[in-house]
Amino acid sequence: FSIEDILARVIWGEAEGEGADGMQAVGNVIMNRVERDSKYDADAQDIVMEYKQFSSVGDPKRLEAMMNLSKDNPEYIQALEISKKLLAGEMEDITNGATHFYNPNTAAKYDWIDEYPVTFKLKNHWFAKGK
């Protein structure tokens, strides 16, 4: 898989059914982490594969769905276009610098939730800027 493809599959895995804005916002979080971690020479693949950072990667069933996702799937095609634009630096950050996101209705009570300010809300996801 190319870096564009990996990023697209994780974007789809995290934001399936959330539309283009939801996919862009998830992609923004990933790219914000790449920027934050640039001193460690991290790229998008390093960020998404980091242990327990993205639930779709850590869930075996979800990961299998992501890996078997058809390249003809309309949401995959949309996620791939978003991925390419994000990697080229051609998309604005609609999350205002968020480095985390969660669904407040279903997320476990993470210790960082109260510490990181919410910067953006979209449908079922809240986006927050970490340290």
Task: Give the residues covered by each predicted segment.
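Bacterial extracytoplasmic/cell-wall-associated proteins, especially those involved in peptidoglycan
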Residues: 1-131
